Curated annotation (Swiss-Prot):
Protein's cellular compartments: Plastid, Chloroplast thylakoid membrane
Gene3D superfamilies reported for this sequence: Oxygen-evolving enhancer protein 3 (PsbQ), four-helix up-down bundle (1.20.120.290)
Listed name of the protein: Oxygen-evolving enhancer protein 3, chloroplastic
PANTHER family linked: OXYGEN-EVOLVING ENHANCER PROTEIN 3-1, CHLOROPLASTIC
GO BP: photosynthetic electron transport chain
Family: Belongs to the PsbQ family.
């Protein structure tokens, strides 16, 4: 009983939490609703402008490109299709005119660029240019050799190509050794080997 009286006689402790009272007036409600309405109107107007500025879908006729096999790598795997066709090697070998054009372009770059790079001692650029051109020349010379009808002519063309590749490997070694005089000599040997193989296959 005494405990109950002590508890009852204690003064009530005021809560430490503050109470926030918000009273919205009619004017503030109207301002909020007016702002909401204005932003909605602006959003709808900009959406209409964007739709008006949109162009129609452009349609392209890619049937010619698809016939050449451009999109084969994006299609599901066709097990009847050879890997060389999927990689584009058959398409590259299909046109002899395009192959001749690539070979002449490679010859021009070898004749024009390599000597300047070697004389300036730009070894990395010389090696990269040589390897870029020979990378396609290997396959293109094989294509031109296989276009020869007679087996003996084909064999002779492949022998000349093999000699050219050997001269290129010697030149590449001289470029890696950074020997200017040796590289210039081997460049001339590689050029003459390329000229002889091209004279035979073209």
């Amino acid at each position: 009983m005494a405990l109950a009286q002590k508890v009852a006689s204690r003064p009530a402790v005021a809560s430490r939490r503050g109470v926030v009272v918000v009273r919205a007036s009619v004017e503030s409600r109207r301002a909020v609703l007016g702002g909401l309405l204005a932003s909605t109107v602006v959003a709808l107007t900009s959406a209409n402008k964007a739709q008006a500025a949109a162009t129609p879908v452009d349609l392209f006729d890619d049937r010619k490109v698809r016939e050449t096999g451009f999109d084969l790598i994006y299609e599901a795997r066709d097990l009847d299709l050879r890997q060389s066709a999927r990689d584009g090697l058959d398409q590259a070998r299909g046109s002899i005119d395009a192959t001749i054009k690539r070979v002449k372009e490679s010859e021009t770059r070898i004749d024009a660029d390599l000597e300047g790079f070697i004389k300036k001692n730009y070894w990395t650029e010389a090696r990269e240019q040589l390897r870029r051109q020979v990378g396609t020349l290997r396959f293109d010379l094989n294509t031109l050799a296989s276009a020869k009808g007679v087996k003996a002519e084909k064999k002779k063309a492949l022998e000349l190509k093999k000699e050219f590749i050997q001269k290129v490997e010697d030149l590449d070694f001289a470029l890696r050794e950074k020997d200017e005089t040796s590289a210039l000599k081997k460049l001339e040997a590689a050029k003459s080997a390329l000229d002889s193989v091209l004279a035979y296959v073209l």
